[in-house]
Amino acid sequence: MGKWWFNSIEGLEHRCGLSKSMDSLGYLIGNTSGSEDPTLNDTNKNIPSWGHSGSYSCNNVDHFFSVRDIWSFISDGTFLVRDNNGNCYSVYLDIENQVFEIDNDSSFLSELESSFSSYMNSSYLNSGSKSDNRYYDRYTYDIKYSWNNHINSCIDSYLRSEINIDSYISSGSDNYRDSYIYSYICSGESVSNSKSGSSSIRTGGNSSDFNRRGRSNDFDLNKKYRHLWVQCENCYGLNYKKFVSFKMHICEQCGYHLKMSSSERIELSIDSGTWDPMDEDMVSMDPIQFHSEEEPYRDRIDSYQRKTGLTEAVQTGIGQLNGIPVAIGVMDFQFMGGSMGSVVGEKITRLIEYATNRSLPVIMVCASGGARMQEGSLSLMQMAKISSASYDYQLNKKLFYVSILTSPTTGGVTASFGMLGDIIIAEPNAYIAFAGKRVIEQTLNKTVPDGSQAAEYSFHKGLFDPIVPRNPLKGVLNELFRLHGFFPLNQNSSRALGSVICSEL
């Protein structure tokens, strides 16, 4: 295996408009024929030349199969090409680590060609139509979309995302979404039309298309790029991870509200520097000694604690919302599906009792699959315990409780404190139900209509009050609190409240 390193300043300056030169960067993938500025350090191998011309033409390299279907192999990071002498090469391109590898393993390539020949007699080939693939005309032997242009487009997209992304944010440009990296990291459209475990190869004309379809579901991003992108569950579009938080985890393509962690919701709602958590050291102790065949309950709790950095499926504490002191609890669906066990119930109950004693408004952000089955009837008792504390808070003390329902809110949470708010707010398109769709269909053997458990449907049936997107949510809460007589503290009152909280926690 030969390995070469490549750098990229000239193409970077040309594409991203950088005025400051970086000495550590050179040309984009280019001259391998030993000219003045070789970018590949090892030139002992006789590799077909990819000239460093203005058009980055690649006329002496043929497609072994089309660019569109290459993205089915993105996990391997490998391109397959053949030169005009009939020699086949596998090309590995790792933009992040600046690695460019070429191999001519004849055994692997001959095995692949045998797969082509065996597939030519298959029924799929006879029934397949080139017109069914809308990428066929664009990516098959098209000089405009040659191999070099494709690779340079990949590098373009990476450079934009890593180096020049601030200019896209400030200008509000959406051009980065047109890049190859953005469009084809996840072969969403081709995968969605395939069944898991099947494989197919399509050949015809002057080119060959190779499709390997074996992904378990349409939502899986390749592991190699999950640190860069967040995929929308609604439109399958990709959102750049570095600034998805600035967009409040709202999909830029369709406006769908993506899932958020409890820490992200606290950061969104609570003023910076005012958050004081409560009962952080409270953890579950496996009260009924529940052991499944897969893993013990305690081991599962430990794994979720390491994964999320949380001790339980809810965070509770005191903070300020536009200067107004509030008691807030935020459930986290990433921790065992936000399930409600004895610790979750105890933390919420203590939060409400503290707010009752301090006459603070309460916000509960719900995201849960319901009661935690690993704790049996003890988890069901939390419904009554929280409801009892809420009754004293709302009816006896006449204080103000706001419930925010996010996706999903189901089971025991829906049947208890989730629906007890003086004002019940739902996020757009939130999944809100008591029993889930799959449970209903398997129990009653009836089909649940699509959208019947969405927030918009429940809103028209009068199940809750407003549907509020994340963008204006903090302002809406601020107006509600002022309407009910809760106002921002002055600096002296704020310091006094902070000292009282610290002394009691």
Swiss-Prot record:
Its main location: plastid. The keyword Plastid applies. GO terms for cellular component: acetyl-CoA carboxylase complex; chloroplast stroma. Its EC number is 2.1.3.15. Gene3D superfamilies: 2-enoyl-CoA Hydratase, Chain A, domain 1. Pathway: Lipid metabolism; malonyl-CoA biosynthesis; malonyl-CoA from acetyl-CoA: step 1/1. Component of the acetyl coenzyme A carboxylase (ACC) complex. Biotin carboxylase (BC) catalyzes the carboxylation of biotin on its carrier protein (BCCP) and then the CO(2) group is transferred by the transcarboxylase to acetyl-CoA to form malonyl-CoA. Its cofactor is Zn(2+). It catalyses: N(6)-carboxybiotinyl-L-lysyl-[protein] + acetyl-CoA = N(6)-biotinyl-L-lysyl-[protein] + malonyl-CoA. Keywords: ATP-binding, Chloroplast, Fatty acid biosynthesis, Fatty acid metabolism, Lipid biosynthesis, Lipid metabolism, Metal-binding, Nucleotide-binding, Plastid, Transferase, Zinc, Zinc-finger. It comes from Calycanthus floridus var. glaucus. Residues 189-213 are annotated as: Disordered. A zinc finger (C4-type) spans 232-254. Acetyl-CoA carboxylase is a heterohexamer composed of biotin carboxyl carrier protein, biotin carboxylase and 2 subunits each of ACCase subunit alpha and ACCase plastid-coded subunit beta (accD). GO terms for molecular function: acetyl-CoA carboxylase activity; ATP binding; carboxyl- or carbamoyltransferase activity; zinc ion binding. The keyword Lipid metabolism applies. Belongs to the AccD/PCCB family. Residues 189-205 have a biased composition (Low complexity). Pfam families: Carboxyl_trans (PF01039). It comes from the Eukaryota. This is Acetyl-coenzyme A carboxylase carboxyl transferase subunit beta, chloroplastic. Residues 228-499 form the CoA carboxyltransferase N-terminal domain. It is an enzyme of class 2 (transferase). Zn(2+) binds at residues 232, 235, 251, 254.
